[in-house]
Design a protein with these regions (language model features):
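Active-site-adjacent alpha-helix immediately C-terminal to a catalytic or transition-state-stabilizing loop
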Residues: 12, 69, 139-175
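Phosphate-handling substructures
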Residues: 78-137
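Amphipathic, non-transmembrane alpha-helical scaffold segments
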Residues: 43, 65, 131, 135-139
Length: 175
């Protein structure tokens, strides 16, 4: 259920949620929407594993970020029976605004404090998404998916997967 008590998952068929492979970023770097590549060997390993384990004929959707797109394209090359769809913006990771590409340790303490004190509403990095806006984007994507009857695999990000789980578990209804 969403914050208004509406069921966002009624008649939602099977969805496999896959996090992108390990990325190539410096330790401590703040990134969300930042388009960083996945490590090629990890992308190949993940694609091979998924190709062996996923059922036939799934619809294949992914975030537009290259760390997800690379896996989707490689998986589709190995499994042409998967129905590759254009990237879905709602599957992208949270936009952390002006913090993107900077080291967490170098971010202004006052901004981080303001963010943690109003996590649901404060725009990350001053120009990015609030957690509430991020979850609303995911919820809108889930609502649109209710009309899709095919089983699907979504290649996305850890934050999106957590958000989907929170929404499906109804953990946000009281907040």
């Amino acid at each position: 259920s969403d914050a208004q008590g509406n069921d966002v998952t009624s008649a939602l068929p099977w969805r496999w949620l896959v996090r992108h492979p390990r990325h190539e970023v410096s330790k401590g770097l703040c990134y969300g929407r930042l388009d960083v590549p996945a490590q090629p060997e990890d992308t190949e390993r993940a694609a091979q594993t998924l190709a062996r384990r996923l059922p036939e004929g799934l619809v294949l959707r992914s975030s537009p970020r290259q760390r997800c797109q690379a896996l989707a394209l490689r998986l589709h090359a190995l499994r042409p029976d998967l129905v590759l769809q254009p990237p879905e913006a709602w599957l992208a990771e949270m936009d952390l605004g002006d913090w993107e590409g900077r080291l967490w340790a170098e971010l202004p303490e006052a901004e981080l404090t303001a963010w943690t004190e109003d996590f649901g509403h404060y725009q990350a990095g001053g120009t990015g998404e609030s957690v509430g806006a991020f979850l609303a984007r995911i919820e809108a994507g889930l609502r649109a998916e209710r009309t899709q009857t095919d089983a699907q695999v979504w290649i996305t990000h850890a934050g999106v997967i957590r958000g989907i789980h929170w929404l499906l578990e109804g953990r946000l209804a009281s907040s």
